[in-house]
Amino acid sequence: ISYEALHVESVDFEESVRSLFQKGYTGLNVTLPLKQLASEFADNQSEESRLCGSANTLWKQGSAIYADSTDGRGLINDFQKQNVELKDKDVILLGSGGSARAILPSLLKKNPKRISILNRSEDKALALADKFSQSQQRIQVRSISEKLNFKPDIVINSTSASTLKQDILLPDDIFYEEA
């Protein structure tokens, strides 16, 4: 098995994937900003890929290209390795972009008490909550500056701030009791 990083522009994505599979590659990992294209490009999508509208893994089986999103399962596996239980917990999900969309289905399967999506753009967070409307009773949308009336058990950062070397400014009372 060999593993190598290749830079591919979005306009060249489909041609590059086809070329790699023709060269004998059996699978590919895909990262930002190409995950949505990967999901749309595939002939067959896993349930996770369909739900979140993105894929980070492509593979060829016969003449068909398959897509999967393993981000959510990876996060859940990490929680399990750390003995972190999500059932009946209050979870804050920072951000409502592609990463949040990719992990939300897996989070919901673990039956948290509530998932509160905090985002700068409330409209974008509402759209994400609407996408998973069957579970909306457990999903709340809040402004990133809104004072919470509960203490979260788990906070997940799915924003791009860390990759952009930016800070996320959150109200102190999310993490600390007021004196």
Predicted regions and their residues:
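Conserved acidic residues
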Residues: 26, 113, 153
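NAD(P)-binding Rossmann-fold cofactor-contacting core
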Residues: 110-133
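Glycine-rich adenosine-cofactor-binding loop
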Residues: 69-72, 79, 84, 88-112, ...
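Glycine/Thr-rich phosphate-binding loops of Rossmann-like dinucleotide-binding domains
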Residues: 38, 103, 164-166
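Residues at the starts of beta-strands that form the adenosine-phosphate
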Residues: 2, 90, 113-114, 138
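Rossmann-like adenosine-cofactor binding region
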Residues: 135-179
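Phosphate/diphosphate ligand-binding glycine-rich loop within oxidoreductases
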Residues: 1-82
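Receiver (REC) domain switch-region micro-motif
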Residues: 28, 91, 155-156
